Amino acid sequence: MASVLILNGPNLNLLGSRSPGVYGTTTFAELEELCRREAGQLGLEAVFRQSNHEGQLIDWIQEAGPEAEAGRSVGAVLNPGALTHTSIALRDAIEAVRLPVIEVHISNVRGREDFRHQSWISPVARGVIIGLGIHGYPLAIRALHLLSGSA
């Protein structure tokens, strides 16, 4: 069974309690269940992870590249959180391993503060989904499945 990696960056573990007017009231555990259900319906195994540390996210991306190249993974859904706007290292890791990535943001970052408009990840992502709340995650999982040719 092929997998789909779902990576969540800093502070996403606080979903449901952090700024519910911006990010909604769905908890991180509920988001994980939503992703696992969507992946399962597509015959994929969801590998769901979160870290507040840039280096850990980079390690997971580097590990996932060979899995995708070998056909054991359809790619990664990545919500880098605030690292979107600051992490060239995360961008470089994605580019280096040629991992298919769909960048996801729960809120519409284009409608928020100016500093959130810059993404270092978008240029190396296969696609970007923003502003659709938690629904962006299952859409990204489905997109990776379709783009992999597994559908």
Regions found by a protein language model. Name each.
Residues 130-151:
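A charged, well-structured terminal subsegment
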Residues 1-4:
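Extreme N-terminal starter segment of soluble prokaryotic enzymes
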